[in-house]
Amino acid sequence: MLRIPVRKALVGLSKSPKGCVRTTATAASNLIEVFVDGQSVMVEPGTTVLQACEKVGMQIPRFCYHERLSVAGNCRMCLVEIEKAPKVVAACAMPVMKGWNILTNSEKSKKAREGVMEFLLANHPLDCPICDQGGECDLQDQSMMFGNDRSRFLEGKRAVEDKNIGPLVKTIMTRCIQCTRCIRFASEIAGVDDLGTTGRGNDMQVGTYIEKMFMSELSGNIIDICPVGALTSKPYAFTARPWETRKTESIDVMDAVGSNIVVSTRTGEVMRILPRMHEDINEEWISDKTRFAYDGLKRQRLTEPMIRNEKGLLTYTSWEDALSRVAGMLQSFQGKDVAAIAGGLVDAEALVALKDLLNRVDSDTLCTEEVFPTAGAGTDLRSNYLLNTTIAGVEEADVVLLVGTNPRFEVPLFNARIRKSWLHNDLKVALIGSPVDLTYRYDHLGDSPKILQDIASGSHPFSQVLKEAKKPMVVLGSSALQRNDGAAILAAVSSIAQKIRMTSGVTGDWKVMNILHRIASQVAALDLGYKPGVEAIRKNPPKVLFLLGADGGCITRQDLPKDCFIIYQGHHGDVGAPIADVILPGAAYTEKSATYVNTEGRAQQTKVAVTPPGLAREDWKIIRALSEIAGITLPYDTLDQVRNRLEEVSPNLVRYDDIEGANYFQQANELSKLVNQQLLADPLVPPQLTIKDFYMTDSISRASQTMAKCVKAVTEGAQAVEEPSIC
């Protein structure tokens, strides 16, 4: 099997600067001059010919080269002529030398590319009309621009057996040109050595050697980086052509990272979801749940208002009847008799509208499903509940301590950043919690929360590692805060972070304390003053309970009085809707322009890609209409006015794609000393231990047939998933 060794043993890679692992930063005086088609350009020593050409805007054709992967140099499509050199060179792998004149469009360069393209097409099936890559295929584009206009190959073409690597990625291996991008992505970015090559020459094949599922939460990205149609999306197969779809730039809400995405739609239906570049968040990758769970947007949807009748059955009704029923209850009960719970997929506009509505009936019992300790600093200080170092900041860290989290399946793109830094920057990682299968080596310190006390006191050996670190990070998973001793865990982590700042070489602007959230709405809800957890509702059960997309099962009918009136507003008939007396159908994230705040405190917007199904409406509009019928009209009629209200309550919520720094760690640590709670002996066990736990975590992914197939393939094998035969 071909393997690209990219471990720290590679000299030079570990010292590479952020963003590009193949160039070496030098002083300006050390720049060297080269010429590209006679045009002068100053570059750093070690820059490749291809990078020098791109610096002057000259695009060199390539198949195997990718900016975020190691150099393979095996497709030879990037051959260029160097003046006075005896042979053409591979631009992606050849470092420039002073005074070189690179000829990108000489006759020798053109002839070399034509020859390479002719060899690549010799065994290619040329089945573009039935290939899902058609219209966005590098092989199509480059054969058009750099290939010959006819073929001299008259022999029989080879055929390669397709591989079954799971329900997400479709393989047509006869189209494969052995660029090895997928292999390098799996080994370097995903950290899963499942893919490789067997055979040599004409018999070379890319595959898993033993037929098995490609076990990665980032597997769908090999579809994007494949330059031909060898790897395509199984759920998307034969459904649309790229020029038929409308593309909408948006963000993902399946986790708390806020990955930037492109939603492709046709005839009012989401056809597929692709990644969008954002260097500070997801780079150009997205998780499989982000990419493939979109079919859950078409199933189990709430499309019309519903009311529970005298027989106890939910029946369809009109908006007027449903809103009048809810308004009547709000007029009958006020104050502590009215409460609300916000779920994990709720946007900031709906959160502020619901807050204003309940405040107008003299209620402040607004809760989130996720628990966050309120003892000590609680949620009063914003730096106490953010990933303060930022996602991209991981690349600057030299030590990371993970506490009670499995970032690989809770927040895959954050985990990919940790692996990137571990691979190239000698990052040292340690974990307190259940041992999990991460994509990098780490020191397992144990699973007892009491280890935190030992580290804080300095008696644990790892205390010295943190003390010697220049840029340490302590990352506490939000799942650990759901425990009964969550406040004590938070206080212990805060103490560790503050002692590191005082005793190590940490500079003033480096932030050690970090909270890693799992759901998209939590940070915005805390910014708006929602109470974390539903304990207040359990202690004082209300007469009217508003469930805003609350499908986490944090509260049941048994927790409430029999006469409690429950309103569910959301987009899926999942956990919350069956217990409701009135259902108000809302819009999903692809159907509204809405604000979400990710785990690092960065506000971003989703955009309208399709209209909500049936009679469903945007959440803030439903709440606004309800307030008018109830006689407590909210003072906004448009989205801009709602966002003005957001700005009044929490200005950072409308500073899009910007992170407002928070630095109250010393104050938070002082307040944490007031926490009167003991750490329990129970081990720290994150809820998502294996990849099986990754696929179905919210109302959208639980409604997805594709995600259900993934769970079945993981538990029973890829062969257990029956795929429809397409002729």
Curated annotation (Swiss-Prot):
Gene of this entry: NDUFS1
GO molecular function, one term: 4 iron, 4 sulfur cluster binding
Residues holding [4Fe-4S] cluster 1: 124, 128, 131, 137
InterPro entries named among the record's database cross-references: 2Fe-2S_ferredoxin-like_sf, 2Fe-2S_ferredoxin-type, Mopterin_OxRdtase, Mopterin_OxRdtase_4Fe-4S_dom, NADH_UbQ_OxRdtase_75kDa_su_CS, NADH_UbQ_OxRdtase_ferredoxin, NADH_UbQ_OxRdtase_Gsu, NADH_UbQ_OxRdtase_Gsu_4Fe4S-bd
Ranges for domain 2Fe-2S ferredoxin-type: 30-108
Catalytic activity annotation: a ubiquinone + NADH + 5 H(+)(in) = a ubiquinol + NAD(+) + 4 H(+)(out)
Cofactor note: Binds 1 [2Fe-2S] cluster per subunit. Binds 2 [4Fe-4S] clusters per subunit.
Keyword Cell division: no
Any GO CC annotation of this UniProt entry: respiratory chain complex I
CDD domains tied to this protein: fer2 (cd00207), MopB_Res-Cmplx1_Nad11 (cd02773)
Family annotation (PROSITE patterns): 2FE2S_FER_2 (PS51085), 4FE4S_HC3 (PS51839), 4FE4S_MOW_BIS_MGD (PS51669), COMPLEX1_75K_1 (PS00641), COMPLEX1_75K_2 (PS00642), COMPLEX1_75K_3 (PS00643)
Protein name, per record: NADH-ubiquinone oxidoreductase 75 kDa subunit, mitochondrial
Domain 4Fe-4S His(Cys)3-ligated-type as annotated: residue spans: 108-147
EC number assigned by the record: 7.1.1.2
Higher taxonomy: Eukaryota, Metazoa, Chordata, Craniata, Vertebrata
